[in-house]
């Protein structure tokens, strides 16, 4: 569902809140080009038109069931980024810190001495 920027951010906030206990929200951003949607034209014509267009960013978010999206214009980019950052700071407070796996303390030289000691006892 295509929303305007403010409605998208409020819907994104609701998505994060509904999945706060259990679930995941995926957010993707990519360059949006209007002329790519019309494939019947020749490629050269589409490239010429895309050079004249204003840069836009397509932002999508989903929790697996509900999908939302918006198109951010270049002139609105800084305001959208500030508001998006605020939504993230509010909702990403329960991130898990992954523990590093401990490295083995045995060195290769100690394991080889154990093998040679075992061989000596067999003989």
Swiss-Prot record:
One of its GO terms (biological process) is protein targeting to ER. Keywords: Cytoplasm, Ribonucleoprotein, RNA-binding, Signal recognition particle. Belongs to the SRP14 family. It comes from the Eukaryota. It is found in: Cytoplasm. It comes from Dictyostelium discoideum. Heterodimer with srp9; binds RNA as heterodimer. Component of a signal recognition particle (SRP) complex that consists of a 7SL RNA molecule and six protein subunits: srp72, srp68, srp54, srp19, srp14 and srp9. Residues 103-116 have a biased composition (Low complexity). Residues 99-123 are annotated as: Disordered. Its main location: cytoplasm. One of its GO terms (cellular component) is signal recognition particle, endoplasmic reticulum targeting. The keyword Metal-binding does not apply. The keyword Thylakoid does not apply. Component of the signal recognition particle (SRP) complex, a ribonucleoprotein complex that mediates the cotranslational targeting of secretory and membrane proteins to the endoplasmic reticulum (ER). Srp9 together with srp14 and the Alu portion of the SRP RNA, constitutes the elongation arrest domain of SRP. The complex of srp9 and srp14 is required for SRP RNA binding. GO terms for molecular function: 7S RNA binding; endoplasmic reticulum signal peptide binding. This is Signal recognition particle 14 kDa protein.
